[in-house]
Regions:
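N-terminal export leaders
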Residues: 1-2
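N-terminal, post-signal-peptide region of Sec/Tat-exported proteins
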Residues: 35-78, 83
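Local sequence-structure signature of Cys/Sec-based thiol-disulfide redox active-site neighborhoods
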Residues: 17-44
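Thiol/selenol-based redox catalytic cores and closely related redox-interacting motifs
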Residues: 62, 68-140
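N-terminal signal peptide c-region/cleavage motif recognized by signal peptidases
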Residues: 11-13
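Compact recognition or signaling/catalytic modules
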Residues: 6-8
Length: 140
């Protein structure tokens, strides 16, 4: 009986630790790199619900993404907005540290970023989405 209780408690704790791994990814219906980014997250253990929309700008503004930080797609995960092709290390850092910001963004569609083809030409600057003006959250 004790072994069953321990196993059940351990299973429930493990599930709670990974509850932030549920993501909703909003994208333009015709965009293929967004699907590649969703697959990148899935390979890392995230459950990703891809939501095609023709109102992507509306989604971005509703979640307080400034136009200067617009990325290819908008992902909602763990109570944060993740804009664009943000690398997994930075995404996981956000979800672990839980800073008091709205989210993070890798603006544009930089070559070599997760889900994009091509060669990375230099470090990526990932910015905070917050009330502060364009603070760098991470460089990868």
């Amino acid at each position: 009986m004790t072994a069953v209780a321990i196993a059940l408690t351990t299973s429930m704790s493990a599930r709670a630790d990974h509850s932030f791994k549920h993501a909703a990814l909003y994208k333009n219906p015709s965009c293929g790199c967004c699907e590649e980014y969703a697959n990148y997250l899935r390979r890392a253990g995230y459950e990703v619900n891809v939501i095609p929309t023709h109102d992507l700008d509306k989604i971005k503004r509703e979640h307080k993404v400034p136009e200067a930080l617009d990325g290819c797609h908008t992902t909602l995960v763990g109570g944060y907005v993740v804009e664009g092709h943000v690398p997994l290390n930075t995404l996981n850092r956000l979800l672990t540290e839980k800073p008091k910001i709205t989210g993070i963004s890798l603006p544009g569609m930089p070559l070599g970023s997760p889900g994009m083809g091509g060669q990375k030409s230099g470090p990526f600057k990932i910015y905070e989405i917050s009330n502060r003006s364009q603070q760098v959250y991470a460089t990868e």
